[in-house]
Amino acid sequence: DSFGKDFDNRYQAMCQSAEDGNVKNFRKTPAKELWKKMLKVLFETSHPWCTFKDPCNIRYTNQHEGVVHSSNLCTEITLHTKASKYKSGEKTEIGETAVCNLGSINLLNHVEEKSTHGKSGYFINYDKLKSTIHTAVRMLDNVIDINFYPTKEAANSNLKNRPIGLGMMAIHDVLHKLNINIDSDESIKFNDELFEFYSCQSIYASSILAKERGFYETYEGSLWSQNIFPIDSYNNLMSYKGQAPLGNGETKKDEWEISRQHVSEFGMRNSNVMAIAPTATIGYINGVEQSIEPNFSVLFVYENKSGNFFITNQHFIDDMKNEGLWSPEVAKLVKDVDGDLSLLDGDIPQWIKEKYKTAFDRNMFKLIECNAARQKWLDQAISFNLYNNSTSLKYLNDIYMECWKSGLKTTYYLRNRAASKVEKSTSEESNSSSSQTSCSIEAMKNGGECESCQ
């Protein structure tokens, strides 16, 4: 149940006790060798996903209630659990099974076109986004009270702590509209500013509900009650790590002052408010890219238990049409290379190739920095895939170490390019033995998505 400095001290004490002969059954394992084995398994299977206990707990809003020992399957939910207590075979105290009600905002629906000096461009309508955030938080809080709970432990946890997980999707679609490459410094700045706004308004929306309906049962003693917001716990985490915080902290001073003052006076309706789920299924249903992920490619096949779905990047097609280059012949060429435009010589302008690179050709370190810019504003975590275009364990070590240094709470799949070839036909039924199973551990083992997080 320990983490942070307490774990460091207890671990060192245990090692010393073993050295002194007080512990008999133990063996020494070089840390580097153990880490290499973990990386090798990750490369071969994409599992197990790496999550970081210290960030999850040092930043946990309800740490006075318990320790975060694990996440959900998709690694965006980081809540504590408690075992039920028994005496003589009878349950004497109902424990807590962490559950969280999820919802995701389609950011592309908040992008509007404007004309300036005869030139058109796109911008995010933040007034509309604010309204959507407040509506979504209210909706998710309502779900807590009308939901079905399969166990008493799940009901106990959800009704006491009232966590919700409001996320986003279509981030890369919006970046395409704004002509920003997802793995650029401009993208890092954009994500920092966007998620600061999203964090401030989500917190404020929950506090407004607290004024109307009362704060959640275990609010007293939480980080919220101590005026420690997600950005504050992020700074505490980076100080513990000895790392410099990313960015400049709160930039929307007036909005944060209103939010902090409201929480101080009325509390929070929900112990946790924000979490970025994968949203693959609902994202593709809505015709947008999942969650905060980069486009996998401009053309690929998405599989779930309902079948195979042909996913195309409409932004790419629109850009090609604007250049007068889109044709059935070009479409066939793109299909022949599995949507990897770098394999086409002379058929597509270089700027389009750069804009629509596959996820494997992106700068992974920039994508990690983008995610760190998001994570610092969130009270829960982000389902975040890593894309590997290398066979080097050193490279894997470097990207996972960068995740840890950046203050990320969790990572999701390690996607390896060699294992991600796209089928060239959508009409042929897949003969793969690793069929996808909705909402199950088997789906995860077979490379599928957990559809409960969609």
Which role does the model predict for each range below?
Residues 1-45, 53, 239-242:
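Polar, glycine-rich mid-to-C-terminal structural blocks
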Residues 75-81, 140-145, 215, 246-253, ...:
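Catalytic alpha/beta core of large soluble enzyme barrels
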Residues 25-29, 39, 65, 89-97, ...:
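Alpha-helix capping and helix-loop boundary segments enriched in small/acidic/polar residues
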Residues 425-454:
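Acidic, low-complexity intrinsically disordered tails
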Residues 15-18, 38-42, 106-109, 129-148, ...:
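Structural signal for hydrophobic packing residues in well-ordered secondary-structure cores
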Residues 4-12, 132-155, 159, 181-279, ...:
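Internal maturation/activation junctions in enzymes
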Residues 42-158, 168-178, 288-315, 319, ...:
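Function-dense linear segments that define catalytic or interfacial modules
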